[in-house]
Amino acid sequence: MFVKTGDKVRVIAGKDKGKEGTITKTVAGKDRVVVEGVNIVKKHQKPSNEYPQGGVIDIEAPIHVSNVQLLDPSTNEPTRVGFKVEDGKKIRVSKKSGNVLG
């Protein structure tokens, strides 16, 4: 997967198109990511120790990784991600600017 937890991304498709956020979780087996503040859904929560009242809560649901694009830190614009091998390590590179991505 070309994105990691902590990356800043922009949603490029779907109901939240244009929103930006940070990736909080990745689901590698299903190629999905959870982006902070994006794809908020209502969940009916049973009473538990964490939620003694229960009720309806808002949570962030995962979206497919193809619907997000990484933001280039130098230009703050969406970019595709390339990979290079330097000193025997695989690193991520911005396709637009050529800069190394964290």
Swiss-Prot record:
Name of the protein in its database record: Large ribosomal subunit protein uL24
Keyword Transferase among record annotations: no
Top-level lineage group: Bacteria
Family: Belongs to the universal ribosomal protein uL24 family.
HAMAP family the record matches: Ribosomal_uL24_B (MF_01326_B)
Transmembrane segments: none
Any one Gene Ontology cellular component term annotated for this protein: ribosome
CDD domains, per database record: KOW_RPL26
InterPro entries xrefs: KOW, Rib_uL2_dom2, Ribosomal_uL24, Ribosomal_uL24_CS, Ribosomal_uL24_KOW, Translation_prot_SH3-like_sf
One GO process term, biological-process aspect: translation
Quaternary structure and interacting proteins, as annotated: Part of the 50S ribosomal subunit.
Taxonomic lineage from the root: Bacteria, Bacillati, Bacillota, Bacilli, Lactobacillales
Gene Ontology MF term list: rRNA binding; structural constituent of ribosome
UniProt keyword terms in alphabetical order: Ribonucleoprotein, Ribosomal protein, RNA-binding, rRNA-binding
PANTHER family named in the record: MITOCHONDRIAL RIBOSOMAL PROTEIN L24
SUPFAM superfamilies, per database record: Translation proteins SH3-like domain
Matches recorded under Gene3D superfamilies: 2.30.30.30
Function: One of two assembly initiator proteins, it binds directly to the 5'-end of the 23S rRNA, where it nucleates assembly of the 50S subunit.
